[in-house]
């Protein structure tokens, strides 16, 4: 039956309101329901579903907006639901229907291919947005009409208006679910059969034309294939472009998200790290409270040495040579101090100051030459030989020109040091330095040294309170060197403190004070400040005292400062081309240039010494400062110690070839052979001695740091479990490190040609290594596993001893009390160690200790002679002052013109109270005690009892049994109360620790020492001894 109302047959499309609404209305569901129509009819899709939604819709078939058809409640709407459809204005008759339909269909295809934007609707005068097959997520959410996506902005007009992203996530999810349902639906047998039947008849044929139904295109027609191919290609290209852009955007977003996440992780880690530092500073356990010092040889350690070796001799026999050399040295020092305090002020006659007379001019010049030849490394560059000779010329000139106080001080210090140096020269094989027939005796030289020193002390007291210029600073630095080598470091430190104070007053610690000076004067002042700074750090470690100057108190001696000095003042004279000069941009490249010129080698060496001194300063502040164990936790302290150890290793590894031990002699010899120098032999000797002294100083720092670390670990066993460090590994590292460094120092000493002034330069570091190796041998002599290592160390000690005293004891006797004391301790320790070693190893040869006893006797007799001569000088000075008569009242029988006859005087002849008092007037009793040969007994009231330490209060840095790694392995024990096992002790020492009478025995042992204390530890500590007097 003909249907003129526009309805289609059930198997085709219908023009009814319900079908049209189901096909084209997507306001709610976001998609057309044409797929449902296809499923109902059973006809296959000619265009893939993903492409159908983007196909343009003919304007003639667009539905008009109407309230009834804007909201759809489902996809299965009945066919009788009304729908307003805009039909064409001209209605054709049924006979013309087919031809008109073909014409209209071609027109629609052209419209689809051109993507027309016309939104005119038949029957409506309004311009509406062109309807699209799917709405974006934003329009769907707001329930507004969506339009086509702009190709430039990739957004619909609504998203452009609201500045929002235009996405279709909701639609994509619906399509994905739809595909899954279709796949599941077609998997059934019935559907498969239906699908196969549909494929055989892809397009349902229409009924007779009179039925009023429009016939669809035949699937096999060329027009239909062209349409489908064009539409498919267009959509595929669009999809590929869109997918590519989405993938790129997705990758960018993923990268941004990952970057943000990593940034958050880094920030969180940084916050936790800062919190960890705060926690470590405040909450982590701190080491046991203890103020460590660099002391090595103490009364407790001396007692342990005797007990560990199992010496059968009594305490009196064991301490006899030690007590005697210490008593002699103490009397000698007291005599010298009384001369400085009482006789350094000249006498007044007729309102004229009468100073001690100096030697003749020729002799004075010869002494000054010897003094300059033996300066070597300690005060290199402080004063030139020309300056010394000019002072002598001015002093002895007949023009009557007088010297100023600073010049008097400088001249007397140089003559005093020259007389002391000449005494060592005339004893050895260094007589090649002599140019004339001046051959003074030892007595003459000692007299010159004595009077020049008294004159120098007179001017020192005049100038020590006022800054008078560089002459005074030169003299103070030279006087400091003399006291350190001849007397003790404590006395020298007092002179150094005055020198540093004057240097700071002159602003030598600031770069700005050098700007207006010429280069030579600036270098001279720079050298003086360098010596102040480096000597201060050395004394700080030796005395366990805080340094006077810190790095924050100056802007000198930095890398930048060295670079500026070299680049501005030195390189322009060495490099002609400006292009080559511009290539030097840092201190290392600048130093690589100046090292090839011998006139600048001193500046080159000073740079590396300055770097080492900075490390020494950090070692003191970390390990030996008063608050070291209060401010730092146990782990933080170990962290800093490891960094310091790495700094020492890096310093040595990064040395220039001219500073390395294996090559410095070859490099410097070639350098000085090629360049002309005023005295190339002396310059070469000075440069070599500075390099050697630098290495001894570095090895000493490593020994001190390593021993302190092992002592710290032993003292804090309770903190092993909570530590994040590998304690056993650290213990083994530092225990072997101080041992190897000590052996290297002695082996290095064996390669030094004998020169007394050179030996004096390294005597403190050498004695440190010597005592460390002695203690190690005693500590491990009973360990069979270390038998070979102990034998090796004993051989090193014997070779070093032979090198020290020389063949046939030619270098044995020396007019230096510190040197003689070292020889006595070395001989005494080596005798007992060799005796014990031969006894343990069942040697067939009998050990003969007689050579060592004879050496000790020779040294003690020579030291006694030096002390007696010093006392005689004091008596002669008293006679010259006229003060001797006041002391002879009531004692004429005891005093004679040739001195005091006190050979038969013993300590029992004196009063019970301590007679030696530096801060009182001289008396006959004091002179008798100073001249007597008896040891000084233990006077109980000399030192306050509160300052006396028991056997358990050992301040020695050497750790007992520090080599046993089992000491640190209780970290693995489950019992938190575990302590050091007593099984670690040797049989001899088990009784040593368990005997209840040890304390009394130690007190009796210590009472045999002069004044009840050990005043020698690689250097004398006289000042503290007399400071404790009450």
Curated annotation (Swiss-Prot):
Modified residues (Phosphoserine): 221, 937
Compartment(s) of residence: Cytoplasm; Nucleus
GO molecular function list: DNA-binding transcription factor activity, RNA polymerase II-specific; sequence-specific DNA binding; zinc ion binding
Compositional bias ranges of the Low complexity kind: 196-208
Location of the DNA-binding region in this protein: 136-166
Keyword set includes DNA damage: no
Transmembrane segments: none
GO-annotated cellular components: mitochondrion; nucleus
Pfam families: Fungal_trans (PF04082), Zn_clus (PF00172)
SMART domains: Fungal_trans (SM00906), GAL4 (SM00066)
Note: Present with 238 molecules/cell in log phase SD medium.
Function noted in UniProt: Putative transcription factor involved in halotolerance.
Name of the protein this chain belongs to: Halotolerance protein 9
The encoding gene: HAL9
């Amino acid at each position: 039956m003909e249907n003129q109302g526009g309805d289609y047959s059930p198997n085709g499309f219908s023009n009814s309101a319900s079908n049209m609404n189901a096909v084209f209305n997507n306001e709610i569901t976001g998609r057309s329901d044409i797929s449902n129509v296809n499923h109902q009819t059973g006809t296959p899709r000619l265009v893939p579903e993903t492409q159908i939604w983007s196909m343009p819709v003919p304007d003639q078939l667009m539905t008009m907006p109407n309230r009834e058809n804007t909201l759809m409640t489902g996809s299965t709407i009945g066919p009788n639901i009304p729908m307003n459809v805009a039909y064409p204005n001209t209605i054709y008759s049924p006979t013309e229907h087919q031809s008109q339909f073909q014409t209209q269909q071609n027109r629609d295809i052209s419209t689809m291919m051109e993507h027309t934007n016309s939104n005119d609707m038949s029957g409506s005068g309004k311009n509406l947005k062109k309807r699209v097959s799917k709405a974006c997520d934003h329009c769907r959410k707001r329930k507004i009409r969506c339009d086509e996506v702009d190709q430039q902005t990739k957004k619909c007009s609504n998203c452009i208006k609201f500045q929002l992203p235009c996405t279709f996530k909701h639609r994509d999810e619906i399509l994905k679910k739809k595909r899954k349902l279709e796949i599941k639906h077609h998997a059934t047998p019935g559907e498969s059969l239906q699908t196969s039947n549909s494929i055989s008849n892809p397009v349902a044929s229409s009924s007779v034309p009179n039925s009023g139904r429009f016939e669809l295109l035949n699937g096999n027609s060329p027009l239909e294939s062209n349409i489908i191919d064009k539409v498919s290609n267009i959509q595929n290209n669009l999809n590929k472009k869109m997918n590519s852009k989405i993938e790129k955007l997705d990758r960018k977003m993923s990268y941004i998200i990952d970057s943000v996440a990593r940034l958050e992780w880094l920030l969180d880690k940084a916050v936790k790290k800062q919190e960890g530092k705060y926690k470590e500073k405040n909450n982590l356990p701190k080491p046991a409270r203890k103020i460590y010092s660099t002391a090595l040889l103490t009364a407790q350690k001396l007692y342990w040495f005797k007990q560990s070796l199992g010496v059968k001799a009594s305490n009196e026999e064991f301490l006899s040579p030690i007590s005697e050399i210490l008593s002699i040295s103490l009397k000698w020092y007291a005599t010298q101090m009384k001369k400085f305090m009482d006789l350094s002020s000249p006498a007044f006659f007729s309102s004229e100051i009468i100073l001690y007379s100096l030697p003749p001019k020729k002799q004075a010049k010869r002494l000054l030459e010897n003094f300059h030849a033996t300066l070597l490394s300690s005060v290199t560059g402080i004063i030139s030989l020309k300056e010394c000779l000019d002072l002598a010329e001015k002093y002895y000139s007949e023009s009557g020109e007088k010297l100023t106080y600073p010049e008097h001080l400088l001249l007397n210090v140089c003559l005093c040091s020259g007389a002391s140096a000449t005494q060592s020269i005339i004893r050895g094989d260094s007589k090649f330095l002599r140019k004339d027939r001046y051959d003074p005796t030892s007595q003459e030289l000692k007299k010159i040294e004595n009077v020049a020193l008294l004159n120098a002390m007179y001017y020192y007291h005049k100038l020590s309170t006022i800054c008078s210029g560089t002459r005074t600073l030169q003299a103070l630095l030279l006087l400091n060197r003399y006291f350190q080598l001849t007397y003790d470091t404590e006395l020298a430190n007092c002179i150094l403190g005055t020198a540093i104070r004057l240097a700071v007053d002159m602003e030598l610690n600031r770069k700005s004070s050098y700007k207006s000076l010429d280069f030579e004067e600036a270098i001279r002042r720079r050298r003086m400040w360098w010596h102040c700074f480096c000597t201060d750090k050395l004394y700080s470690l030796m005395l366990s005292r805080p340094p006077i100057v810190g790095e924050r108190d100056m802007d000198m001696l930095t890398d930048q400062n060295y670079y500026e000095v070299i680049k501005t003042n030195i390189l322009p004279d060495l490099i002609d081309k400006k292009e080559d000069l511009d290539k030097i941009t840092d201190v290392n490249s600048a130093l690589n240039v100046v090292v090839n010129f011998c006139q600048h080698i001193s500046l080159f060496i000073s740079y590396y010494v300055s770097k080492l001194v900075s490390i020494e300063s950090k070692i003191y502040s970390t390990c030996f400062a008063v608050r070291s164990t209060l401010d730092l936790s146990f782990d933080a302290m170990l962290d800093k110690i490891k960094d310091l150890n790495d700094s020492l290793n890096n310093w040595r590894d990064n040395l220039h070839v001219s500073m390395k031990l294996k090559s410095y002699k070859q490099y410097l010899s070639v350098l000085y052979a090629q360049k002309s120098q005023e005295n190339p032999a002396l310059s070469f000797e000075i440069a070599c001695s500075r390099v050697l002294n630098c290495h001894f100083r570095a090895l000493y720092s490593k020994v001190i740091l390593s021993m302190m670390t092992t002592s710290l670990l032993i003292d804090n066993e309770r903190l092993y479990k909570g530590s994040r460090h590998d304690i056993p590994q650290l213990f083994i590292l530092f225990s072997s490190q101080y041992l190897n460094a000590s052996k290297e120092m002695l082996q290095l000493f064996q390669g030094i040609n004998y020169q007394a002034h050179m030996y004096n330069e390294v005597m403190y570091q050498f004695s440190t290594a010597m005592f460390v190796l002695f203690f190690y041998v005693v500590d491990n002599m009973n360990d069979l596993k270390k038998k070979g290592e102990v034998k090796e160390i004993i051989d090193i000690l014997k070779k070093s001893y032979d090198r020290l005293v020389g063949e046939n004891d030619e270098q044995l006797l020396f007019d230096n009390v510190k040197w003689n004391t070292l020889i006595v301790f070395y001989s005494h320790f080596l005798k007992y160690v060799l005796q014990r070693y031969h006894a343990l190893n069942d040697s067939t040869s009998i050990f003969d200790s007689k050579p060592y006893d004879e050496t000790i006797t020779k040294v003690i007799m020579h030291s006694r002679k030096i002390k007696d001569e010093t006392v005689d000088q004091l008596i002669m000075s008293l006679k010259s002052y006229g003060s001797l008569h006041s002391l002879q009242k009531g004692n004429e029988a005891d005093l004679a013109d040739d001195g005091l006859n006190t050979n038969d005087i013993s300590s029992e002849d004196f009063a019970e109270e301590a007679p030696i008092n530096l801060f009182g007037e001289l008396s006959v009793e004091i002179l008798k005690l100073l001249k007597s040969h008896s040891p000084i007994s233990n006077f109980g009231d000399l030192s306050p009892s509160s300052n006396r330490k028991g056997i358990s209060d050992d301040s020695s840095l050497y750790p007992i049994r520090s080599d046993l790694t089992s000491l640190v392995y209780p970290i693995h024990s489950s019992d938190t109360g575990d302590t050091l096992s007593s099984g670690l002790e040797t049989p001899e020492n088990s009784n040593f620790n368990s005997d209840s009478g040890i304390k009394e025995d130690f007190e009796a042992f210590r009472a045999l020492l002069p004044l009840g204390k050990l005043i020698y530890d690689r250097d004398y500590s006289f000042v503290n001894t007399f400071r404790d007097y009450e």
